[in-house]
Amino acid sequence: MDKFKLENLGGGITAVISKEHGFGTDALLLADFAAVRENNRCCDMGSGCGIIPLLWLKKNMNRPVAAVEISEQGCEQMKKAAEVNSLGGRLEIFNEDLRRVREFLPAGEFDVVTMNPPYK
């Protein structure tokens, strides 16, 4: 895990971050602002290290959360975060290009969809 760093966020949540895929305050705010409920079906697009789905799942959501990320490294970080946080199969990771989203995620399947694209 040399290329990754574990970051304890408190509340039993540990994020797996790297130079390429980290997160900022905006991701924490978006995860909360989305106001997901226990039985919502949720998807985060362009998930990076998976911080938003991770925060949702640690709120004891009953349903799996989908995370779409084009970067293999980002998906690897999410897999490690799922292991570290004992999420079992509750994090569904799609290593895909969002331009093809209709090919792998059916329309109307989700109650909540978020996206926090990178910016400078």
Predicted regions and their residues:
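Conserved SAM/SAH cofactor-binding pocket of Class I
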Residues: 32-120
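Class I SAM-dependent transferase core
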Residues: 1-37
